[in-house]
Amino acid sequence: MFLSPGXGPATEGGGLGPGEEAPKKKHRRNRTTFTTYQLHQLERAFEASHYPDVYSREELAAKVHLPEVRVQVWFQNRRAKWRRQERLESGSGAVAAPRLPEAPALPFARPPAMSLPLEPWLGPGPPAVPGLPRLLGPGPGLQASFGPHAFAPTFADGFALEEASLRLLAKEHAQALDRAWPPA
């Protein structure tokens, strides 16, 4: 076989022939980091169904602000983890493999009912400057206007409160301030 100069494979001549493109660097996706809220919602959906249909996955993806393909891959990985745990538990006989406790179901729609005790220096008292409201704690008039969750922690059992709950707390706080200190 006879080759004319420049008609050989690209590796021989060191250059690219007409119509050939340089090999593209393969794009590698970064690992997805899920928020606590996303993981909680995904785990709840997994408890309901290990094989959700595409409609359910799309709904869940919209709810947790993830692409549907990320939700689909999460379910594939979660099923693999579940099968691995099942094998370990059934293969070990009476001694089951130690498992981490499941995440508790948190009532994200409403704030927690528990309240934190106030430190003595945060309690109600006379204002530092007469005529100005005390800024480090609720005054006597505000105490009753706050609900039972007024001084609730921002974390419940290690989970951050959902954005809607925080907005509700902020709205209630603003309303309480409006009732206690009307603009002059």
Swiss-Prot record:
Membrane spanning stretches: none
One cellular component (GO) term of this entry: nucleus
UniProt superkingdom: Eukaryota
Classification via CDD domains: homeodomain
Region (Disordered): 1-31
Keywords: DNA-binding, Homeobox, Nucleus, Sensory transduction, Transcription, Transcription regulation, Vision
Record flagged with keyword Nucleus: yes
Ranges of biased composition (kind: Low complexity): 1-10
Function: May be involved in modulating the expression of photoreceptor specific genes. Binds to the Ret-1 and Bat-1 element within the rhodopsin promoter.
Subunit structure of this chain's protein: Interacts with CRX.
Protein's name in the database: Retina and anterior neural fold homeobox protein 2
Organism: Pan paniscus
